[in-house]
């Protein structure tokens, strides 16, 4: 197909989890003949094993489709698939920056969910043309008219012309493609201007080096060209230029408006940053593209190798993962209990789980993870403000004037029958009610201000179980507020274990400490001496459990005889245990560190 900028359409699909986004992408690929029947598997664009197992999209993927429209002209459509989960909204915002339009996919039975709303607002910020698609119309419980009304009332988009489709059966797919061609504008940009290409993603290939996924905004890029990264100033020679079919396929050149990939023998991971602008070394562009706002990590945890010798391997793996996931942050730290490791920042709990699983699977590492926590702000008596990412770094209580914790604005959508349980859960988690509105006759939208630290444990699971899976949640950071917080330490055999320290609200400290020591008692194996497990706030012990010692029966050989003989043996054993207690080391299994996670409000 001849290149013509006016016949290029760059679009993405936005939807809540499970509204059929990846299946719709499959149908579009199939309809336009991008893949043969043999290559077609379900959820083609979810290429990671993890994505298939969990049934969610984690990484955005790009693919080029060629489509002959009803007007008889050939169009080049670049689809950029996006994730739907709240933790990956950064991936979504990056793919939106590379598009001119978006398909808004809404489940005909479920209606609008919290996540859909958040992504639509992102798309509107980027001035994208939005095409509503009501999916799963073949479900018995589908109610397209109600969903159309919801789209108009809640989002304010005209849904009278929404496409009714079923990604499963393929109904409505041609209509969607026609809408993309007629409604989404062609890309802007100047063909003759110096090259400007936006890196919207990248991954590391052991043979080719860094593979940059780019959207060419101005000019063109071809094999052999000398390019320059505008943020770092480094120069490279392009070795391969290509497109996504969705597998990588070489072409000689990428022109204005096209989406594809570039390799240039970039060996150092830091040289190609996502959001950077690529330009021609000999004829550089005067200003870079706006790029992206930096992702702010919300949740932090420590990652430590089980074997101390794997530290370098972990460092290397994190550097390569960061290339593929720009929202991950990490810095080295040491723990008295766990040795050398990294303090990592994530966008949320699911993001943390995924990164941990990817490190273990893709890089074969064995890891210990400490309990996740948020960033607290501490105003000291000396008048300075410090940010605390690690609970063990909290200053002593005497030096603290007050502590602030991050709050979020949470939007919860649920059927009206579940208003009670949802409000009860939010109150338990120290939530502050802001307002409530009915979206339709049966569905309600609740707005709450909640402490982020209360959300990151099991809030989402609890919300789902109390509403039988019908509620959906979306949240965004809403500044810091002052709270009455204390540090809860865990002492094992009299020693503070820094990796188990957590920062909790004073009202919940006793309950949390009680749960924690009970849980640890079941997880720490018995030793030859007894082990006290204590939870403490400051110098005050608030809960204690004891792991009893394993005792050898020293009286087995004594048959009858004098009681003093037996007492002598028992005293001797007691003295030995006492000595052992002073020098003995307590073995703490990995489960003990994870116990802190699962100590919810039971």
Curated annotation (Swiss-Prot):
Bilayer disposition of the protein: Peripheral membrane protein
Domain of life: Bacteria
Main location: membrane
CDD domains per record: EF4_II, EF4_III, LepA, lepA_C
Cellular component, GO, one term: plasma membrane
Phylogenetic classification of the source organism: Bacteria, Bacillati, Bacillota, Clostridia, Eubacteriales
Name of the protein this chain belongs to: Elongation factor 4
Physiological role: Required for accurate and efficient protein synthesis under certain stress conditions. May act as a fidelity factor of the translation reaction, by catalyzing a one-codon backward translocation of tRNAs on improperly translocated ribosomes. Back-translocation proceeds from a post-translocation (POST) complex to a pre-translocation (PRE) complex, thus giving elongation factor G a second chance to translocate the tRNAs correctly. Binds to ribosomes in a GTP-dependent manner.
SMART domains listed in its UniProt record: EFG_C
Enzyme class: hydrolase
Assigned protein family: Belongs to the TRAFAC class translation factor GTPase superfamily. Classic translation factor GTPase family. LepA subfamily.
PROSITE patterns cross-referenced by the UniProt entry: G_TR_1, G_TR_2
Location within or outside the cell: Cell membrane
Binding locations of GTP: 18-23, 135-138
GO MF assignments: GTP binding; GTPase activity; ribosome binding; translation elongation factor activity
Species of provenance: Pelotomaculum thermopropionicum (strain DSM 13744 / JCM 10971 / SI)
GO biological process terms on file: positive regulation of translation
Domain tr-type G: from-to ranges: 6-188
Pfam families linked: EFG_C, EFG_III, GTP_EFTU, GTP_EFTU_D2, LepA_C
Keywords, alphabetical: Cell membrane, GTP-binding, Hydrolase, Membrane, Nucleotide-binding, Protein biosynthesis
EC number: 3.6.5.n1
Catalytic activity: GTP + H2O = GDP + phosphate + H(+)
């Amino acid at each position: 197909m001849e290149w013509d900028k006016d016949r290029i359409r760059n679009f993405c699909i936005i939807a809540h989890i499970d509204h059929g986004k990846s299946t719709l992408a499959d149908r579009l690929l199939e309809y336009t003949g991008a893949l043969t029947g043999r290559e077609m598997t379900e959820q083609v664009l979810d290429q990671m094993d993890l994505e298939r197992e969990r049934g969610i999209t984690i990484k955005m993927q790009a693919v080029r489709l060629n489509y002959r429209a009803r007007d008889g002209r050939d169009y080049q459509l670049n689809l950029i698939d996006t994730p739907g989960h709240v933790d990956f909204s950064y991936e979504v915002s990056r793919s939106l920056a590379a598009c001119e339009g978006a398909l808004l996919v809404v489940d005909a039975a479920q209606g609008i969910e919290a996540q859909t709303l958040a992504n639509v607002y992102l798309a509107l910020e980027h001035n994208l043309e939005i095409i509503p698609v009501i999916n799963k119309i073949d479900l018995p419980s589908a109610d397209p008219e109600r969903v159309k009304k919801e789209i108009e009332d809640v989002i304010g988009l005209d849904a009278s012309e929404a496409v009714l489709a079923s990604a499963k059966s393929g109904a409505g797919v041609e209509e969607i493609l026609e809408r993309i061609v007629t409604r989404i504008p062609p890309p802007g940009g100047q063909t003759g201007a110096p090259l400007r290409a936006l890196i919207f993603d990248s991954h590391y290939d052991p043979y080719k080096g860094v593979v940059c996924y780019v959207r060419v905004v101005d000019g063109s890029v071809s094999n052999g060209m000398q390019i320059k990264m505008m943020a770092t100033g480094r120069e490279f020679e392009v070795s391969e230029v290509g497109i996504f079919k969705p597998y990588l396929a070489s072409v000689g050149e990428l022109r204005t408006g096209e989406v594809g990939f570039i390799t240039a023998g970039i060996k150092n991971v830091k040289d190609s940053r996502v959001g950077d602008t690529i330009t021609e070394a000999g004829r550089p562009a005067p200003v870079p593209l706006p790029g992206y706002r930096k992702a702010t990590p919300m949740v932090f945890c420590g990652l430590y190798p089980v074997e101390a010798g794997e530290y370098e391997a972990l460092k290397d793996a994190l550097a390569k993962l960061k290339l593929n996931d720009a929202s991950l942050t990490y810095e080295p730290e040491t723990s008295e209990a766990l040795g050398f490791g990294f303090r990592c920042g994530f966008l949320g709990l699911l993001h943390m789980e995924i990164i941990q699983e990817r490190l273990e699977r893709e890089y074969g590492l064995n890891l210990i993870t400490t309990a996740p926590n948020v960033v607290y702000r501490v105003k000291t008596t000396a008048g300075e403000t410090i940010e605390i990412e690690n609970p063990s770094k909290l200053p002593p209580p005497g030096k603290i004037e007050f502590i602030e914790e991050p709050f979020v604005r949470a939007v919860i959508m649920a059927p009206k029958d579940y208003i009670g349980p949802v409000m009860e859960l939010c109150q338990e988690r120290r939530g502050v009610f802001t307002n409530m509105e009915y979206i339709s006759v049966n569905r309600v939208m609740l707005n709450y201000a909640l402490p982020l630290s209360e959300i990151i444990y099991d809030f989402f699971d609890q919300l789902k179980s109390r509403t039988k899976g019908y509620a959906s949640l979306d949240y965004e950071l809403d500044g810091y507020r002052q709270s009455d917080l204390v540090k809860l330490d865990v002492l094992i055999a009299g020693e503070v274990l820094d990796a188990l320290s957590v920062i909790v609200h004073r009202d919940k400290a006793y309950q949390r400490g009680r749960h924690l020591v009970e849980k640890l008692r079941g997880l720490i194996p018995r030793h030859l001496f007894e082990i006290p497990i204590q939870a403490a706030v400051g110098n005050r012990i608030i809960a204690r459990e004891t792991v009893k010692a394993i005792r050898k029966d020293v009286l087995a050989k004594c048959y009858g005889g004098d009681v003093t003989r037996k007492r002598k043996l028992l005293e001797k054993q007691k003295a030995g245990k006492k000595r052992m207690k002073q020098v003995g080391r307590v073995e703490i299994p990995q489960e003990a560190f994870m116990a802190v996670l699962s100590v919810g409000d039971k």
